[in-house]
Each structure stands twice: as C-alpha cells, then as structure tokens.
C-alpha cells in the first residue's frame, strides 16, 4: 500500500533543497525503487518534505541507504509522520 511521508526539519531553510541537489540525493531518490513523488519547501520556521512511496519499506530502504550515511556528525534523523495514501488526484 502506498504511503505518504511528511518530515519537518526545524531551523532548515530553502538552501536544503540546493544542498540535496548538489549531493546527488534528489537524482538517487527519483531512481529509487518505490519512489512516487516529492514536494518540499520552507515555512517560517522549518523545511517541510512530503513524499509518496509505494510502501513504507521502500522509503525506509532508501532513507537508510542514502540519507542516513550523509547526515553530519552529531545530527540524528528525525522520525517522519507516515500514513497510508487513500487518495491521489493528478491531472488527466
């Protein structure tokens, strides 16, 4: 079952997306098995990431293999909110 992942990164700004792009994480994500979509942006106090994956396991495999190894020393991964996708509307 497809899942939605929402991650909130306090104190992070729009530079996060550029850094992820430069590190190649976004290209790796697009090629990852089970990846469906990604949207993200800065709010007044954090950077919010919303992704859709074919399964929780697909997201976890990608996150553990591509994001966790790149976290700076002393930075721990946040626990995202995840829920099963029940409706996805796209243009015809």
Cite the ranges covered by each PLM segment.
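Short S/T/G/P-rich N-terminal loop/turn motif that feeds into the first structured element of a domain
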Residues: 1-50, 54-69, 75-92
């Amino acid at each position: 079952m497809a899942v939605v992942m929402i991650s909130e990164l306090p104190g992070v700004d729009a530079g996060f997306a550029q850094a992820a792009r430069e590190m190649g994480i976004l290209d790796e994500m697009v090629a990852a098995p089970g990846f469906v979509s990604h949207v993200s942006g800065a709010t007044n106090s954090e950077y919010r990431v919303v992704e859709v994956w074919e399964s929780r396991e697909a997201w976890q495999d990608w996150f553990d293999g591509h994001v966790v190894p790149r976290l700076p020393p002393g930075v721990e991964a946040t626990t995202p909110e995840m829920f099963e996708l029940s409706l996805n509307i796209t243009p015809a």
